[in-house]
Amino acid sequence: MLQVPGDVQILKEDNVTHSFCGLASVGWMYQKIRDSFFLILGTHTCAHFLQNALGMMIFAKPRFGIALIEEGDLSKNEPTLDEVIAEIKADHNPSVIFLLSSCTPEVMKVDFKGLADHLSTQQTPVLFVPASGLVYNFTQAEDSVLHALVPYCPVAPAGEKSVVFLGSVNDATADDLRAEAEELGIKVGGFLPESRFDRMPAIGPDTILAPIQPYLSRVAVKLERERGSRTLHSLFPFGPDGTRVFWEDLAREFGIEVDLRDREKAAWEKISRQTAMLKGKKVFLTADTMMELPLGRFLRSAGAEVVECSSAYINKKFLAKELKALEGVRVVEQPNFHRQLEDIKRLRPDLVVTSLMTANPFVGHGFIVKWSMEFMLMPIHGWSGVITLANLFVSPLDRRSKLPAFDKAVWLEGVMPAAE
């Protein structure tokens, strides 16, 4: 049992991370950095995973690809990728190439950093991104991408105070965040990442880093150490409560006092139908995206009973305010999934937020399920994302209320008795 400031107790268990591989981050990162190419050194398993997970056919010529490791490569000191890189440059003309690791070459002890340095040129740098599922879950790989981009962020001079938002969001959400900051009188230095490689924000000793995703602690620490920047430790801008606190805390960093309680009240009123459905509902969050703590905090504020809020990894300093807001909730790091399964059977929550891997088994047991990955892919940040966020939670409850009673026999038809 771990103790954190504010008497929040975190139960740490010993399970493996039930999460997508870090390579899944390619799905949103290549779309965000439009002049990039993501190259994965991996196996046929990696290729099948990406094609199925991202739903991308090869003739679409997406800006990501896999250099396959074959049996013959096992006897080589290092894989040779010069021809692959030349082909990528000819077909896509990227400004930057990200070289991602995967499990098999990690086990083979491939020197990815040396390989990236060898392939890199001044015109087209090749940046190593550790993303192996042996070490990282799929959201942490975004942290690795931003980590690799830090040397390409210009150094902002001392005295030039501005905010840089950390985290990949779509352009509409980025525009909303920028407009809100400027309306409050906060100077915006940019976003890490920006949509183009040559537009990465200048970061210096008077830059305030405002993380908008809860899994970017490593890049924040790197910027603090190397640039002297300061990280905003606040709630994340999910839901009316988190968005209000986020903007009030950020404004305070710039010497601006704002009171956004009326704005928060209006946002809650917009989702009154959704909160009425959530009120009193028991919700269980299993570990997957590392977004679980702010999502659990929003659910609690919306009137739901959060039975358990678990996450693969919990950085206690980075998430201190979220943890404080969850006082009294069972918070678990690296949860034991078998224990969770038994607890869920016993507690019978009204909604289980879980990974794609475990969703169907829970449905088979008669539970209402929400895929946690959907929160990664939808615009749920800030004031503009409040309705989308609330709808993500209530949509499965809505759907179940319109369906006939669950027929377990349909799921088990033709299955051997031992499988029940």
Curated annotation (Swiss-Prot):
Pathway: Porphyrin-containing compound metabolism; bacteriochlorophyll biosynthesis (light-independent). Binds 1 [4Fe-4S] cluster per heterodimer. The cluster is bound at the heterodimer interface by residues from both subunits. InterPro entries: LIPOR_BchN/ChlN, Nase/OxRdtase_comp1, Protochl_reductN. GO terms for biological process: light-independent bacteriochlorophyll biosynthetic process; photosynthesis, dark reaction. It holds the Pfam family Oxidored_nitro. Keywords: 4Fe-4S, ATP-binding, Bacteriochlorophyll biosynthesis, Chlorophyll biosynthesis, Iron, Iron-sulfur, Metal-binding, Nucleotide-binding, Oxidoreductase, Photosynthesis. Its EC number is 1.3.7.7. It catalyses: chlorophyllide a + oxidized 2[4Fe-4S]-[ferredoxin] + 2 ADP + 2 phosphate = protochlorophyllide a + reduced 2[4Fe-4S]-[ferredoxin] + 2 ATP + 2 H2O. Its cofactor is [4Fe-4S] cluster. [4Fe-4S] cluster binds at C21, C46, C103. One of its GO terms (molecular function) is metal ion binding. It is an enzyme of class 1 (oxidoreductase). Gene3D superfamilies: Nitrogenase molybdenum iron protein domain (3.40.50.1980). Belongs to the BchN/ChlN family. Component of the dark-operative protochlorophyllide reductase (DPOR) that uses Mg-ATP and reduced ferredoxin to reduce ring D of protochlorophyllide (Pchlide) to form chlorophyllide a (Chlide). This reaction is light-independent. The NB-protein (BchN-BchB) is the catalytic component of the complex. Protochlorophyllide reductase is composed of three subunits; BchL, BchN and BchB. Forms a heterotetramer of two BchB and two BchN subunits. This is Light-independent protochlorophyllide reductase subunit N. It comes from Chlorobium luteolum (strain DSM 273 / BCRC 81028 / 2530) (Pelodictyon luteolum).
